[in-house]
């Protein structure tokens, strides 16, 4: 069978390409400048042709208000352009962002491309040079990445080897690069989710929770410097050691056995949502590791904060509330 990788790439992000065909109609109305909190809050109403953040806006509505594509015009749609940004050994799972006429997209190995949204021509490319041996951390086939964040003059990407990187939005030059991994005697993890950026910070979780010997947490980094603003752990560590924050003391009461030797899991591999009204970050926490509760937490209870929605204050990193959807996840 003949392979057509360019066609496959086009089909994955065709909806945005189709919208770009009509870009000249609304291009003059696109605000120019940095992506800010207020700009995202007012999107898409102020600029329906832009896609400023993961899910389109802080509400992650994923809905375009453009009207040029309708039942009368859809038959006239055609291919505007296509470009090759990957190979067979990766997956593209992120929606490209479109800011000021430039498309920002990442491939499975966390390489960022800035493309002219009208022509598809490459403006710049940033390669974090991820060691390909990290494919061993992939849970679901080839390397994959769910996209980037654009905020305050920078483009942010989480890499398959567990780093968070900021590059200059205009030039593609690296601004800072931090390793998000905390060893703790546990296994290395990857990052496949898209960062979220708001309130002067960039937020990222991690993947590999299904691999065992991982302990989930979300970290907020200063968007300008890359310094850690706060870190919220999602499952408790060794109770013989001081808890990192009070919520872990609460959570430890719901676990049994020596769960900390397994890590416990509870990674937040993608689901992070910023709420500007309450200045909060909502974290969707994943499954436990190992999966069977009687192995990771024999005699345990709810195993907080597995399979839980956690609300955290973005300034302090302290928990507002939580709701566990599956107590004692098994």
Indicate where each model-derived feature is located:
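Repeat-blade elements of multi-bladed beta-propeller folds
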Residues: 51-55, 91-111, 137-163, 188-211, ...
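Blade/loop signatures of beta-propeller domains
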Residues: 28-79, 238-248
């Amino acid at each position: 069978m003949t392979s057509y990788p360019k066609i496959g790439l086009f089909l994955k992000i065709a909806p945005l390409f189709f919208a770009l065909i009509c870009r000249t109609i609304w291009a003059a109305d696109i605000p120019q400048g940095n992506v800010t909190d207020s700009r995202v809050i007012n999107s898409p109403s102020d600029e329906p042709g832009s896609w400023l953040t993961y899910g389109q806006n802080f509400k992650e509505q994923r809905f375009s208000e453009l009207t040029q594509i309708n039942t009368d015009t859809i038959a006239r749609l055609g291919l505007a352009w296509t470009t090759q940004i990957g190979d067979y050994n990766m997956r593209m799972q992120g929606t490209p962002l479109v800011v000021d006429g430039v498309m920002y997209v990442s491939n499975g190995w966390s390489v960022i491309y800035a493309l002219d949204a009208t022509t598809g021509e490459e403006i710049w490319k940033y390669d974090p040079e991820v060691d390909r041996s990290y494919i061993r951390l992939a849970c679901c086939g080839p390397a994959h990445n769910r996209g980037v964040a654009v905020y305050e003059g920078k483009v942010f990407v989480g890499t398959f080897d567990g780093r968070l990187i900021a590059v200059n939005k205009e030039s593609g030059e690296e601004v800072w690069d931090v390793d998000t991994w905390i060893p703790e005697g546990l296994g290395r993890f990857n990052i496949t989710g898209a960062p979220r950026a708001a309130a002067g910070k960039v937020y990222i979780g991690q993947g590999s929770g299904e691999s065992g010997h991982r302990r989930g947490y979300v970290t907020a980094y200063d968007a300008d410097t890359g310094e850690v603003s706060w870190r919220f752990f999602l499952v408790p560590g060794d109770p013989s050691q001081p808890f990192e924050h009070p919520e872990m003391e609460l959570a430890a009461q719901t676990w049994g056995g020596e769960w900390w030797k397994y890590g416990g899991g509870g990674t937040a591999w993608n689901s992070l949502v910023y709420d500007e009204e309450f200045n909060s970050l909502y974290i969707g926490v994943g499954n436990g590791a190992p999966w069977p509760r009687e192995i990771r937490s024999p005699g345990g209870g709810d195993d907080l904060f597995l399979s839980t929605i956690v609300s955290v204050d973005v300034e302090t990193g302290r928990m507002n509330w939580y709701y566990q959807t599956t107590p004692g996840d098994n």
